[in-house]
A protein has these predicted regions:
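Functionally engaged cysteine thiol sites
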Residues: 14, 91, 150
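Short beta-strand segments
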Residues: 89-91, 113, 143-147, 229-234
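Extreme N-terminal basic, low-complexity initiation segments
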Residues: 2-9
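Cationic, low-complexity basic patches in intrinsically disordered or flexible, solvent-exposed regions
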Residues: 9, 19, 24, 28
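Catalytic core of membrane glycerolipid acyltransferases/transacylases, capturing the structured
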Residues: 95-112
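Divalent-metal-activated hydrolytic enzyme cores
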Residues: 49-84, 107, 116-140, 151-244
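N-terminal low-complexity or amphipathic/hydrophobic leaders
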Residues: 79-95
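Short, Lys/Arg-enriched N-terminal segments with co-localized hydrophobic residues
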Residues: 18, 31-35, 40-51
Length: 244
């Protein structure tokens, strides 16, 4: 059964701890142990069971049963190395599951996510991802994907006492400035929503501009080894469309 120890779930059978490299599937806990479909506060425990982590491990059990095992050949190939064709730069928003909305298989997308799908200029973390993707993985396409109802974009309108978020969002502030210089101040909720949509899409274009400031990427684009694309995902409709 699943037991909670040091805030982690371990699998015990016959009183012995199974090694981490065990090839056995994780078995669901006995029926009636807890209601897997119920909503519990984060970190809540019922009779020693870590509900949040248990849900993730049960999800992995289903993944191995319905996806990994039927496609074992594909996953064994990936175990020896990756060869993605696309670097995907997206937002960290939990409502967007990149592989799910694109139906991309494991191994097809090399993914970098952050708040606001931002390409910071002269950032070591981002530069490392970009260099590895372009120089070593030799991706053919780089995608920057924005989305509707983006909290990062809406935060551009608010004062904040946060230590890090405002500094990070300075990388997107120019998108807000551009749109506000083109349109009248919104007077209705619909107009306000449209303004945010325009800023979200302008931000994608701005981040493409930032991307092109990296010499290794610009060189790859100039030599036609890499193409850059701007996409926008609508949370309300599920539609993903090209905007740049």
């Amino acid at each position: 059964m699943y037991l909670c120890s040091n805030d982690q779930l371990i699998l015990r059978q016959g009183g012995r701890r199974q090694p981490d490299h065990s090839e056995r599937f994780l078995e669901p806990p006995p029926k009636g142990e807890y209601n897997a479909g119920a909503h519990y506060p984060h970190g809540h425990r019922v009779r020693g069971v870590c509900i949040v982590i248990d849900k993730l491990l049960l999800g992995n059990f289903r993944f191995r049963e319905t996806d990994f095992t039927p496609n074992i050949g594909h996953y064994r190939e990936l175990a020896s190395g990756q060869n993605p064709e696309t670097l995907w730069i997206g937002c960290s928003d939990s409502r967007i599951q990149t592989g799910h909305i694109t139906q991309a298989r494991a191994g097809e997308l090399f993914i970098q996510r952050n708040i606001g799908n931002i390409v910071p200029v002269h950032d070591w973390n981002f530069a490392t991802v970009l260099e590895y993707a372009v120089v070593h993985l030799k991706v053919k396409d780089v995608v920057i994907c924005g989305h509707s109802n983006c909290g990062a974009i809406r935060a551009l309108d608010r004062e904040s006492n946060d230590s890090y978020i405002p500094l990070w969002l300075n990388n997107a502030r120019e998108a807000k400035t551009r749109i506000d210089s083109r349109i009248q101040a919104p007077e209705t909720v619909r107009e306000a929503d449209e303004r945010y949509r325009l800023i979200e899409q302008e931000n994608v274009k701005l981040q493409i501009e930032h991307l092109m400031t990296y010499p290794l990427l610009k060189k790859a684009v100039d030599e036609k080894r890499v193409e850059v694309h701007g996409l926008y995902y609508d949370l309300a409709t599920g539609e993903l469309k090209k905007i740049a």
